[in-house]
Amino acid sequence: MPVITLPDGSKREFANPVSTLDVAADIGPGLAKACIAGRVNGELKDACDIIDTDSELSIITAKDEEGVEILRHSCAHLLGHAFKQLWPEAKMAIGPVIDNGFYYDIDLDHKLTQEDIDALQKRMTQLAKTNYKVEKRVGSWQVARDTFEARGETYKMEVLDENISKDDQPALYHHEEYVDMCRGPHVPNMKFCQNFKLMSVAGAYWRGNSDNKMLQRVYGTAWADKKALKVHLNRLEEAAKRDHRKIGKQLDLYHMQEEAPGMVFWHNDGWSLFLELEKFIRQKLGQYTYQEVKGPLMMDRVLWERSGHWDKYADAMFTTNSENREYAIKPMNCPGHVQIFNQGLKSYRDLPLRMAEFGCCHRNEPSGSLHGLMRVRGFTQDDAHVFCTEDQVQQEVSACIKMVYDTYETFGFKDIVVKLSTRPEKRIGDDDMWDRSEEALKQALTANGIAYEILPGEGAFYGPKIEFTLHDCLDRAWQCGTVQLDYALPGRLGATYVAEDNSRQTPVMIHRAILGSLERFLGILIEEYAGKFPTWLAPMQVVVMNITDKQSDYVDEVVNIFKESGIRASKDLRNEKIGFKIREHTLRRVPYLLVVGDQEMDNKEVAVRTRDGVDLGKMRIEDFASKINEQISLRSLNLLED
């Protein structure tokens, strides 16, 4: 007679074993109708799974985040069901849940077109509208193997052969004539899978290995109701308008080409953005007392072996040979910074030593994963390493946290999610060391008034870390900043300092990044601002336009005044109508558009309007320059107002 304890503490006793669905029905028909699955003693279970002992139960519906994730997973099965009806010869690989949706990898000789995606969407809708029941059957490994062998599903057979023990009892989910294998849980009825949309198709290697066959991956999104689906699709539409690749081309910021995959060709205006971003971070380095250094781009393999990177990152490193020596282009800056630290004897009085670099790094990312500025092979890290004593860890981490928040606030990012990753199962050091280091990070976060989530066991083997994830205007998450303690690398590379008692000690190393990759962060900013950069960051801050040729000399005079005061200004003296010029520079997202005619020339003024069409009226040249320079010095996010 199981006793079921519900989240509110109430208990229900049953004479026989029950399922989550049975308990929901006992509570009321409305809950039974809405029940998707259950969390039994902390573990997700199908609504049909039997509970035969006293248990704690949470009933999951589409209102729960877990419920939405489950229905997305079931939509992947629905996609498989529809696919096999339209292309019976297709072989199904895997269909997991991803952020906001799902995908399925399929082996099919026919290359899918948009018309095929539309046909799949239609068939999925038809199937879901029948509200058919999903039947879960748990059986032996051999039953599952025979089932998929009879259906010619070679990828499912491979998963069984290589990833599932013959002692296990895999769950098969029957969607009418279609059968799929999964850990589950899944919806009990397809009535829950009504609000979905197939989004795109792409190539994907089986198991992510380029030596394997290229499959076709169909992506989809699914939500609990029509309203949520519509909101998401509207957000995607806005994201498409803000796509940094599209805006980058429109504004002539950069380009990429096949001869240098994952490498950026910065154009004049894009490079201006890059340099301004670098200048800003360099000022922050000065405020927080960092040394700026520059390490070599390439180092001998021997050093990477000593640091431990060769064992872990060799496949991602570009290498070359010269004079019988093998070199690797650096994928990260930390080993080089330890080499700089090791030059000359260091005392405890020299610590903390804060070392920063705009390090140009290269990683051999898979070609299929490259994505504009967001995922590249050549990138610049705003990387820093703090060498300190263990007693200094908390204060140094606290300073790093302040620097991260100061920086993000300048760009308007205020929704920051912070996660603390703690000791993994395989790690160096004793528990006492980990207790101290984790406590130091916790105290630093608490001292800065920062709420954080703990990720147990997610730290690196050499130390715990803090991750900073910012959310943009479309509520997308971007993990950028990290503060990572490292108790291993300094020792591996022989870093020591003379302690107060004259003993040789190994410093603690703090890895610190704020933006992460400058290229990626610029991609984020392009999309966050939709190309409308704040005045201080904008490649061109002011454009001055004449109405007739009579004002040409005056335009030159105005532009020169602006340039002398440090404002990035240009002129447009083309023999075009002023309305045409204004429209063109508005599309270029120049913050301020200045028009001069005879009256402005005679009065030594400029007529000012913003790229958003706000007319600020006439101003004296010096007054406008003063206001703009104040905006720039404050790094204001807003334009001048009327």
Swiss-Prot record:
Its localization reads: Cytoplasm
- InterPro entries in UniProt: aa-tRNA-synt_IIb, aa-tRNA-synth_II, aa-tRNA-synth_II/BPL/LPL, Anticodon-bd, Anticodon-bd_dom_sf, Beta-grasp_dom_sf, TGS, TGS-like
Q: What is its EC number?
A: 6.1.1.3
SUPFAM superfamilies, A to Z: Class II aaRS ABD-related, Class II aaRS and biotin synthetases, TGS-like, ThrRS/AlaRS common domain
Residues recorded as binding Zn(2+), renumbered to this chain, are 334, 385, 511
What note does UniProt attach to the cofactor annotation? Binds 1 zinc ion per subunit.
Care to name a GO molecular-function term for this sequence?
Answer: metal ion binding
Q: Listed GO cellular component terms? A: cytosol
Would the keyword Metal-binding be found if you checked this record's keyword annotation? yes
Gene3D superfamilies documented for this protein? 3.10.20.30, 3.30.54.20, Anticodon-binding domain, Bira Bifunctional Protein, Domain 2, Threonyl-trna Synthetase, Chain A, domain 2
Question: What chemistry does it catalyse, as a reaction equation?
Answer: tRNA(Thr) + L-threonine + ATP = L-threonyl-tRNA(Thr) + AMP + diphosphate + H(+)
Q: What does this protein do?
A: Catalyzes the attachment of threonine to tRNA(Thr) in a two-step reaction: L-threonine is first activated by ATP to form Thr-AMP and then transferred to the acceptor end of tRNA(Thr). Also edits incorrectly charged L-seryl-tRNA(Thr).
Q: What is this protein called?
A: Threonine--tRNA ligase
UniProt source species = Shewanella sediminis (strain HAW-EB3)
What is the name of the gene encoding this protein?
thrS
